[in-house]
Structure formats: C-alpha cells, structure tokens
C-alpha cells in the first residue's frame, strides 16, 4: 500500500482532561471498541491486581493517576488509531505539552458534574497555540450532573471555542435515558450496567417517531422541545471550523457503561485529520514524501523491569520505516541502523516490521538519543516546536549510602533524559540538584531510583528559586560571566549552561548587569 493510503487511514491523537474526569476509563473503552482488549478491567498485572491497561507503571497503579504518556495502537473499522494517553496530574505539564506536539488532534474529556476544570484550561491553551482540532466528550452522564446547556456555555466562555453538539443527553443521573444524535436524527437508548463488553444500544430512527413516545413517555415531547432550543442556540457542526481548532463537536455519554463511546469513535475516524505536514528549520515536511523522517518527543527509562532499557518515542512524520533500515541522526551527524524498533499496546511491546506517518515507534536508546532529535534519510533539517521548560522547584539530592554515588548519578541522568525532571551539576561543587515543574516529580524520582536503580536518596532544600538557560554569542563576555557568577551556575543534563537564581530579585539584578546575555525560560530541544 502506498504512503498516501497508509497515511489516510491513520489517526494520531491524545486525550486531555483534568484528573478524575474519566480519561483512563475512556482510553480503556476505546481499546475495547477497537477490539484491542476483550474485557474491560481484566488486564491484570502479575500480582493479579486489577488496573487499567494504560496506567502501567507501579507508581501510577498505586496513585490512580497517569504519570507518563503511554502509547497505544489499535484498529477500528478501516482505520488505524494511535492513541497517546497523557498525564492528567498537574505536575506533568512538560511531558503532556511535548506529547501534544506529536498528535494531529485531541479529545477533551469533561466531567458532567464539574464542568471545565483548571487542568483542562491549561491543556487547551497548549492546543490553541498549535491550532489542534479538538473533540469533546462530556462524561459521567449516569450520575447527577450540571445542566447540559450550562456546560456548553462554560466551555464556550472559558475555553473560547465554539460548541457544536453532535449528541445530546436525554435526562441525567438516575433518569438518564440515552442520547439523541443530531446529525443522524436517531435516538440511542441507555441500558446501565454494560461495563465490560461492547453491545449494540437500542436505536430509534427519527425524533418524531411514535416509538419514542412509547419508550420515553412524557420525556419524548420534552426532548423535542429541548432539541429545538439547542439547534437554535448552538453552532452546527462544520468540519472546517473543527480542523482550525475554532469549533469543538460535543458528545455526551458514560464511558464506564460503554455508552456514547461508539458514536464518538465513529465521528472521530470520519472527521479527525489524518497525519499532517510538519515544520522544520528549513521547510515543511509532508507525510506522503517517499523518504522517512521523524522526531523524538519522549524518552522513557525502564519500561520493562525485566530489561534495563530506555526507549525513545519517535513520531514518524514522512515516508516508511522498515525493519533494519538506516536512518540519519541529524544532531549527531551520523547514520544508524534501526533493527528492533517497537510498537506499543500499553505495556505490550512488539517489534515493528514497518510503520508509517502518524505512527509512534520506540527506539532502543543507550544514552545517545535526546528529546527533540530528528531522524531522516540523509537530509539535514530539524523538526521545530518541541519545548523544554525551566524548572520551578529544586531539591538537593543526598545519598543514604555514600558508596552508591555512581548508581545515583546514572539513575538521575537517565531519569532526567525523560524530560520531566532536570538534573543540574553546579560548576563550583559536586552537588547534584534536581529541578522539576511540580512536587510529585520528586516522589516519582525517589521511588524509581529505589525500585529501578537500587539507590535510596533523601532530598534537602536548596537556595534556588528558578533557573534560566544562559545564551551568549560573545565568548569573552561569557567567560567573564562564568568567572564572576560561578557560584550560581550549573550544567543541565544536556551540558547547557544554566543560571540557578537564589531569588527573583537576584535574577533581575543579574539580568540588568549582563544585558549581552539572554536568560531563557524555555529551550528548544
């Protein structure tokens, strides 16, 4: 099959939500509808602990939050879907942000009782920057919820995006009876308790069908009146607005009961964009180009406790990956052979024989691959727009057993390569300082150091409030700066000079004193 045909059948997207809106449940149900798993909730770990397929790291299982981005591929009808599960917890902004650079569209999950929550607002800002098309699933309709019109108003006013309802709920909570599909003019009736298997919902054709009155009684005429109001007050779905990220189609349902998910998935494969062109520092790369290219948006250490491995997740931007092919690693200016790239089904990994634009493959990484790296078939361009953020929180890392210094350094280096934490090594001392965007990161690192590297560490406070990357073209100025400010300077994991400011005032004074130097909050990988 040609590159064009392979590209056209693919959909690569991420699910975004506030914690507890039901993102992991919906992820699992999408896999269920795609036939990737047979029974919901039955994927067991060796200890037979029940946990959702996509939250596969020990700490995630204990805490019930998605800590790292998981990649899952599954077929649905004539399509192949690549689903990137993003961390729902507030501390994992960076990882989520980078994941959103690797997708062509997003699915937003909203809890019908809570509406728009802070984390959703933050993620929407990222999507807006990239004009990412967004579909919305309003979940938990089987519980007591806020009025649906109110939820739409809130999405429009807070997230600044037009809402186009595609399905509309009939009742809510105990009185939830189903959904009306505005485009199909059909009603799907709700039967609670279908948690584990996918079954066909009973369907009634036409809102004016007398059969509806038999099934719903007085609710039928209420529904007809409500739909008239909804059609008058909301935007009709139009694909162009959706693809520009200006309008979001809205679907209602109950993911835990498998209800409303099929309608969402059908609309998704039909309307969501296939893999799109990608910007580089020299030109736009189109997916249908013959030559292979791709970029690394995430690195994950120790995905399989049985193998001490690091996997670099690469999004294919153009051409075809074939097992054993040679690819050019642009940053290192050298050709490498890729023999054993992986594809993923949440923790189940298989060797990829081939992969196409939109697919995510895993490359075994022995420390040479970094986030943001570009691979091509000889061309020397670099994909742009994969950011690194300055840390906001800092801790000094101390060993409980001083003899484990080497293992500590190895662990911290490998874990910081994943991009969720940053390791700083001060110029003036042998201290190790860990920086993160959120507090939970420190717990994750301590937990993983102990479990994956057999190193116990403790944290101490350190006199650093923020970090800035130091950029200066004038070597003489930079040398003078290094000498005068060495006590506040460190190298990050990538060997980039960083200023660790003991206070905001100190940073402002230093920036004023050194106008030739750029103090940057973000850095492109």
From Swiss-Prot:
The residues that hold GTP are: 17-24, 85-89, 139-142
Q: According to its UniProt record, where is this protein located?
A: Cytoplasm
Q: List the disulfide bonds.
A: none
Give start and end of each tr-type G domain: 8-276
- Give the molecular function GO annotations: GTP binding; GTPase activity; guanosine tetraphosphate binding; translation release factor activity, codon nonspecific; translation release factor activity, codon specific
**Major place of localization?**
cytoplasm
Q: Which Pfam family, giving just one, matches this sequence?
A: EF-G_D2
Q: Which InterPro entries match?
A: EF-G-like_DII, EFG_III/V, G_TR_CS, P-loop_NTPase, PrfC, RF3_C, RF3_dom_3_sf, RF3_GTP-bd
Listed GO cellular component terms? cytosol
Q: Which UniProt keywords apply?
A: Cytoplasm, GTP-binding, Nucleotide-binding, Protein biosynthesis
From the UniProt annotation, give the residues forming the signal peptide: none
Whether Signal counts among this entry's keywords is: no
Please give the biological process terms from Gene Ontology that the record holds: regulation of translational termination
Q: Note whether ATP-binding occurs among the keywords.
A: no
- Function of the protein: Increases the formation of ribosomal termination complexes and stimulates activities of RF-1 and RF-2. It binds guanine nucleotides and has strong preference for UGA stop codons. It may interact directly with the ribosome. The stimulation of RF-1 and RF-2 is significantly reduced by GTP and GDP, but not by GMP.
According to its UniProt record, which protein family does this protein belong to?
A: Belongs to the TRAFAC class translation factor GTPase superfamily. Classic translation factor GTPase family. PrfC subfamily.
Protein name stated in the entry: Peptide chain release factor 3
